């Protein structure tokens, strides 16, 4: 081994190869045979003879030294590692010799010459499996024989062996704490080779190959000291070391300190004691001690003393760099590493700025200054120009400009400007501003802002300093300039335009470039121009949306014109006749529906249970922007004729019970005044047409999709010129309602009056259904009785109305059913009749105001709700020519204030 401290490292490939080879039986056999050959003495002799012949050819005499056991010396290498020195003997080593001599004092004695040989150190382990180092020093047998009879000679041999190890391998051995264990040899003996040059050797032709192979052997790690060449290295030093009674152990002193947050701040007293440690840590290495009881430790405020007599002699004195608190210290011995750790806190005296005193020399400084002669500075007779330093880098600041009449305001965006460094120089048409600021690296930056105004004279210049900028105000004699020049000096100017035309951008083809993706359209409906309270609306739309809106408006106007022409050509008498026939069919079908309700009572209860279990996907206000709300509480007539029409129907309004009704599109059709101008409901109507009747009433769950002719004749729908029957309309509405069934379903918005009358704040709507189940059953039975008993009453009322009407008017009669809904829609959905009629029937016995809207057609529509599908509707001829009716449909949404 070249180095004792080197660890034997085995790579993965080598470990894998060795494992595979040892797993092979043939390899194990061959390896066992090889080991047997090495142990065979005959083979060893043959190997030694061949090696001697080879070395003799090169002029060297080779001897194989086999160390025989003698005695062992135990010590410490460099104060850290245990070491064992084997003092061995061999007959091939030279015998000791002595001569009589006299020392410097004149005393006579013997001068001994002791030959020895030593091998390379090797690594081994002690009885505790701790690393140690083993050295072999081989003497002649006569040398060891003399040590047994003479103690002084034994000490001489021991010192010689230690000197040989220290001189050859440059280590330091502890000679004070030497031990001699009861061992004759440490470890396994290894053969050593001694090479000596032959004296009468004839020089032969050098073989380059042999010289190359044995070049390393010339620097053999095995050394042999002849008696003539034997000299002890640093002999005086070793003698002085042997005279010491104690060994100074190796130690290290550590300064330990914890960093506090307040020391990282920029305060003046933050780093007053930053260099003083918090505690001192003294680590002492004691490899020959087993516990702390074998040594004595004394600690003072400035020193540490350690002494040990048994089993090893150690003595240590350490002066501490800081004053410590000896009473607060602690010590700990580590048996594994055989180290003693002493922890001593440092006594710190916290100083403040007030503790700083002024020395006597500083106090005498003012007196000394007064005694010095004062040098007077003579003023210059002629002013001299001071040129700026050419090494200074001039920076042009970033700025922004504003103009108002003949006043210019320049904002120079520079921070931390020194106000004392601002210099302004005003010329006829030029302004120069110089200033400095402190940059991020705490170094000054120099700025120059130079201005020139062509065809203008500067009358006044002012400046204001702020934390983030400088405002430079320049006043000119006139404001008729279109540009100015700015830069660092007069030779480096850039032209800046005062006003740039941003909107007029012409491309290379000569066309104007505009971003028409978003425009502001100011529109005022032409239909509403004659209204008294016209409103101006501003909408922000894209270009595509404007084109689509124009197409919808043109289509809507065409439909309105077509319906108006159809109304003029249609005969009112024929329309009323068709309506009476339809109402007769409706009355017959209603009688059948009463019987069907009893048969499907079980199915209704199951359907109601399914409704309770339904969940809504969005909040109740997610589609408020899609609803149309019409308030008809107190209609204000715009002309006198309209007022008279409302007065004529006042009696019938009071007789009708106050009930809520979910009206259809036909019920809320726009009303026209005498001039033919539509009311505000035209906008709501166009919104409903665009959504294709997607939404139902807010108070009912009716799935009936009624056609145009269910509530009134075709001539009343002058705005809907179509011949589509109710079935096709129902299919289209079902398709559109299915698209929004999950997102916009059951969205309800009530006013304060309905909230206070119909709902309780501490319960939910589904909870109220369960509580009102019995009420719904009783109301359904009462409804059946009224249908059977109300035929004669309805006939008497209709006869009374016929006698009171003016001659020549057409009256629509309904003898069996008071609803204008076609029987087809009811028959198609017999099960969909809503059983939740508590909202409509809650005010059954109260009087309700009729909803009346005047139009050109001389008819009056009076509607009152008994339930969602049974609506009493009567068309009466009004006394006034300007009266009109309104059509109701189930998918309209209203807020009716009571």
From Swiss-Prot:
Biased composition (Polar residues): 641-656
Protein name: Protein kintoun
Family of the protein in this entry: Belongs to the PIH1 family. Kintoun subfamily.
Highest taxon of the lineage: Eukaryota
Main function: Required for cytoplasmic pre-assembly of axonemal dyneins, thereby playing a central role in motility in cilia and flagella. Involved in pre-assembly of dynein arm complexes in the cytoplasm before intraflagellar transport loads them for the ciliary compartment.
HAMAP family found in the cross-reference section: Kintoun
Compositionally biased intervals (Basic and acidic residues): 575-602
GO cellular component: cytoplasm
Annotated region described as Disordered, given as residue ranges: 558-680, 765-822
Keywords noted in UniProt: Cytoplasm
InterPro entries registered for this protein in UniProt: Kintoun, PIH1/Kintoun_subfamily, PIH1_N, PIH1D1/2/3_CS-like
Bias kind Basic residues: ranges: 603-616
GO biological process: axonemal dynein complex assembly; cilium-dependent cell motility
